[in-house]
Amino acid sequence: MRPNDRAADQVRPIKITRNYTAYAEGSVLVEFGNTKVLCNATVEESVPRWLKGQGKGWVTAEYGMLPRATHSRTRREAANGKQGGRTMEIQRLIARSLRAVVDLEAMGEFMITVDCDVIQADGGTRTASISGASVAMADAFQHLVDSGKLKANPMKGHVAAVSVGILGEDVLCDLEYVEDSAADTDMNVVMTEEGKMIEIQGTAEGEPFSHEQLLALLESAKKGISEIVAAQKAALAN
């Protein structure tokens, strides 16, 4: 039995709070159960040097965890003088996922940076970051439209992500930490709102998984992501 008696293919309760902070052009607190991530999207009227003069924009991301986001305190990466490999991998994943749903040429020479800060971690922090960042980015683009700097929102749709895994004989969706740490297979899936794949990260931690199990994992992820996209759209409609 899963925590909180969730069904195997059921995502955790999702809460998306927009305009969470006062200064960012897009600010979202996203909650998946006990996992909470603050996603702030900042607009800059400039692009990286290698893009200057091309009439294209750029979307990038940064990711971090507060020291007590987990059960025991983790030393700040700034205190260590460098980012860890996991952090760099995750923020690149977030950025790639966001760019996949943006028409960079239509956004002009603007850059959006989405900072994803994990306030509390209970599994699925990277997937929650992507799902929250999509909403924050949508608000940042709408800010550019409302201010007359863009004619239309250059987002082609929403992007969302979820973790899936195999625990025993069960395919589970949106794993909490206690499930993730015990899973035989752990997979992160990123999709567009149309169900097109952006990224699949899957590893057999214990027993190898079959082709049939892979398809079951992807089907579970697709269902979960459709629920997340519905929550994103509902949040933006308010």
Swiss-Prot record:
UniProt keyword annotation of Cell wall biogenesis/degradation present: no
A biological-process GO annotation: rRNA catabolic process
GO molecular function: 3'-5'-RNA exonuclease activity; tRNA binding; tRNA nucleotidyltransferase activity
InterPro entries xrefs: ExoRNase_PH_dom1, ExoRNase_PH_dom2, ExoRNase_PH_dom2_sf, PNPase/RNase_PH_dom_sf, Ribosomal_Su5_D2-typ_SF, RNase_PH, RNase_PH_bac-type, RNase_PH_CS
Residues the record lists as binding phosphate: R86, G124, T125, R126
Enzyme class (EC, first level): transferase
Protein's UniProt keywords contain Heme: no
PROSITE patterns: RIBONUCLEASE_PH
Keywords annotated in UniProt: Nucleotidyltransferase, RNA-binding, rRNA processing, Transferase, tRNA processing, tRNA-binding
Domain of life: Bacteria
Catalytically driven reaction(s): tRNA(n+1) + phosphate = tRNA(n) + a ribonucleoside 5'-diphosphate
Enzyme Commission number(s) of this protein: 2.7.7.56
Function: Phosphorolytic 3'-5' exoribonuclease that plays an important role in tRNA 3'-end maturation. Removes nucleotide residues following the 3'-CCA terminus of tRNAs; can also add nucleotides to the ends of RNA molecules by using nucleoside diphosphates as substrates, but this may not be physiologically important. Probably plays a role in initiation of 16S rRNA degradation (leading to ribosome degradation) during starvation.
Protein family membership: Belongs to the RNase PH family.
Quaternary assembly: Homohexameric ring arranged as a trimer of dimers.
NCBIfam families registered for this protein in UniProt: RNasePH (TIGR01966)
Protein name per the record: Ribonuclease PH
Organism: Vibrio vulnificus (strain YJ016)
